[in-house]
Amino acid sequence: MINNVVLIGRLTKDVELRYTPSQVACAQFTLAVNRNFKNQDGQKEADFINCVIWRKSAENLSNWAKKGQLIAITGRIQTRNYENQQGQRVYVTEVVAESFQILEKRDNTANTSSLADSMPDYGPEPDLPF
């Protein structure tokens, strides 16, 4: 069986970082992922996909990614259920992200620098002999 998801989309809001009672980091976020076709009005529509990421990756995503940023994630689809306050069974389907990659720099108005800004600039690569 294969359960593998790869998504590229924009964060609809800042990542919500929480900790379980045993202090395991868990971050929830929603990605807006454009569809590959346009509707009757010529506009591209988007799907809004709920995602969750755990542990150190959750803390890193929360620290580095902000609303509107383009990110890529890999993970799997998972369904869970719980009983709400009214005693009804609620089913939730979401993507459990295993890794992420930020695909663009943060807005220049942010007070903190991005990882890309802290990388040294080595200049162009020399011509290789092969």
Swiss-Prot record:
Which segments of the protein form a coiled coil according to its record?
Answer: none
* The entry's keywords: DNA-binding
Biological processes per GO annotation? DNA replication
Top-rank taxon:
Bacteria
Q: Where is the SSB domain?
A: 1-104
Which intervals of the chain are annotated as region Disordered? 108-130
Kindly state the subunit structure of this protein: Homotetramer.
Identify this protein by name. Answer: Single-stranded DNA-binding protein 1
Native organism is: Streptococcus pyogenes serotype M18 (strain MGAS8232)
Q: What is the lineage of its organism?
A: Bacteria, Bacillati, Bacillota, Bacilli, Lactobacillales
